[in-house]
Amino acid sequence: MKYSAKNTALSQIDSNIILAVFEDGELSPTAMQFDQLSQGYLTRLIQVGEVSGKQGQVLILRDIPNCQAQRIFIVGCGKKDKITERQYKQIIQKTIQTILETQASEVVSFLNEIELKNRDIHWNIRFAIETIEASHYQFDTFKSKKTDASLVLDRFIFNVPTELQQNALQAISYAQAIALGVKYAKDIANCPPNVCNPTYLAEQAQSLAKHSNLINVQVLGEKEMAELNMFSYLAVSQGSANEAKMSVIEYRNHPDKNAKPIVLVGKGLTFDAGGISLKPADSMDEMKYDMCGAASVFGVMYALATLQLPLNVIGVLAGCENLPDGNSYRPGDILTTMSGLTVEVLNTDAEGRLVLCDALTYVERFNPELVIDVATLTGACVVALGQHNSGLIATDGKLAEKLLNAAEETTDKAWRLPLSEEYQEQLKSNFADLANIGGRWGGAITAGAFLANFTKNYPWAHLDIAGTAWLQGTNKGATGRPVSLLTQFLINQSK
């Protein structure tokens, strides 16, 4: 899809036009112009009940007096002063669905005239593009019959005042980069585990170096990790025939070459059967999504390189598999982590933290400004927060606040969970420094508390995306979250 911003007189538009109308007969500014241009055509439709302005109604008009447009899409938006971000998203989705059914190739949109509380035209345009791209998304790589690309809308033009052109163009630039990052994160996550193994994940990371000359990629195999004493990470991989691989993606574009990097660490379990503590068979296929943390870090790094933000950022994709085998690690094993701390394994299905603890220790060598890990870590987080908010745990209040601000800006929502010393009590072991689980209560928090033991040398935040990384049912598939949140965080950091 090609997006642009122009300022064209309504009477001169000869393609397709999208106009907003509201309940109680209220019209957007350009809808008023259209009504005057067409000698009250829209007013008459409202009077006879053809146009209600209710959200969800889209009326298609053709052959309108004094108007060159092929079609006019009259979009009902509900109460003018009560439109929420969620409703705005639904309005965009319904509009795009209707347009695609007409096979229109170009539209000129005035929906950016919709006013939302505390949002400006930059946000309206950016959010619209991200919504449109998400609506277009198809993952048909492994289907014998592909989606018919001829049905896809080709050009989407935002009609904005001349003085707002630069603002609109920046919004388009940001939105397209983020939307591509989300798409690639979804593509990797939706890939089946017989294709997307740790080696495939590493190959995807290496492809980023071809996308941008600002990126360098190093891949560590099991031999290199063993030399670094990453025995906790390696234990998880023991039951798999596929070698564990950790990809380190370095993006350097800060004016000060010595500026400390921001580090993003993504959990990359390309399949998690639970190991010896085997998961139930029901929905086990969804455990290909246990690498969504790594996929989202990949997506963020792609968006970052596309935007060429003036930052130093390092993305780590911690890839491996957790499978049952005669060589698998066992409940009762005691592992020595890269940090030197020992961990008693009480459940092999609490493996993500065993991988991440070594990855979090590894990134100390970069002397980071801050570190954020992203992981589908706990079912307990899904129980606590459902599928709308990612769980946020942080040792640094300012970092947590910045992430929550980015979540609010993008509607890629997160909710901060507590992290106090009491939770460490649940991780005590009679035989090692730590246990890898903390019992029944507060599982999302105790998982974060476990990781906190390996992050004492830098500001750290943890995003548990177990509830937000993918959808089930008829809409089954990866969401690409939290690419939007993290990219916005980096945009804010670059200012």
Swiss-Prot record:
Mn(2+) 1 binds at residues 272, 349, 351. Its EC number is 3.4.11.1, 3.4.11.10. GO terms for cellular component: cytoplasm. PROSITE patterns: CYTOSOL_AP. GO terms for molecular function: manganese ion binding; metalloaminopeptidase activity. InterPro entries: Leucine_aapep/pepB, Macro_dom-like, Peptidase_M17_C, Peptidase_M17_leu_NH2_pept, Peptidase_M17_N. Its cofactor is Mn(2+). It holds the Pfam family Peptidase_M17. It comes from the Bacteria. Its main location: cytoplasm. The active site is at 279, 353. Binds 2 manganese ions per subunit. The keyword Manganese applies. Presumably involved in the processing and regular turnover of intracellular proteins. Catalyzes the removal of unsubstituted N-terminal amino acids from various peptides. This is Probable cytosol aminopeptidase. It comes from Histophilus somni (strain 2336) (Haemophilus somnus).
